[in-house]
UniProtKB/Swiss-Prot annotation:
This is Large ribosomal subunit protein uL16c. Belongs to the universal ribosomal protein uL16 family. One of its GO terms (biological process) is mitochondrial translation. Coiled coil: none annotated. GO terms for molecular function: rRNA binding; structural constituent of ribosome. Transmembrane segments: none annotated. Part of the 50S ribosomal subunit. Disulfide bonds: none annotated. InterPro entries: Ribosomal_uL16, Ribosomal_uL16_bact-type, Ribosomal_uL16_CS, Ribosomal_uL16_dom, Ribosomal_uL16_sf. GO terms for cellular component: chloroplast; mitochondrial large ribosomal subunit. The keyword Chloroplast applies. It is found in: Plastid, Chloroplast. Keywords: Chloroplast, Plastid, Ribonucleoprotein, Ribosomal protein.
Length: 135
């Protein structure tokens, strides 16, 4: 699963996801892509599940690019712990995704196979997405 090798700070603020994505919203590498339509935190496990689903469906041939990276640590407090005594310890990593962001790109396969593979990857995502074609 994806996670940063090292970070400047162990814990982040939660932040908020307002507006649309101005970066990473055009197809750069492949011919087909999966684009987010809603804001969300996408975990490294979800990213990996989508990538695996696409790879399995594309079989031989075809190249896949993952355009998001989980660089935000999410902390979780132990269960049945009283309030106070600081923030919890980092548990997993998420990518902050805003509407318009490209999640995956794909090329080297026919459109019908790409549609099928990307549809399966989309079902692994916690948000509504759309299939787009470059050009």
């Amino acid at each position: 699963m994806l996670s940063p090798k090292r970070t400047r700070f162990r814990k982040h603020h939660r932040g908020r996801m307002k507006g649309i994505s101005y970066r990473g919203n055009h197809i750069c590498f492949g011919r087909y892509a999966l684009q987010a339509l809603e804001p969300a935190w996408i975990t490294s496990r979800q990213i990996e599940a989508g990538r695996r689903a696409m790879t399995r469906n594309a079989r031989r041939g075809g190249k896949i690019w993952v355009r998001i990276f989980p660089d935000k640590p999410i902390t979780v407090r132990p269960t049945e712990t009283r309030m106070g005594s600081g923030k919890g310890s980092p548990e997993y990593w998420v990518a902050v995704v805003k509407p318009g962001r490209i999640l995956y790109e794909m090329s080297g396969v026919p459109e019908n196979i790409a549609r099928k593979a990307i549809a399966i990857a989309a079902s692994k995502m916690p948000i509504r997405t759309q299939f787009i074609i470059s050009g």
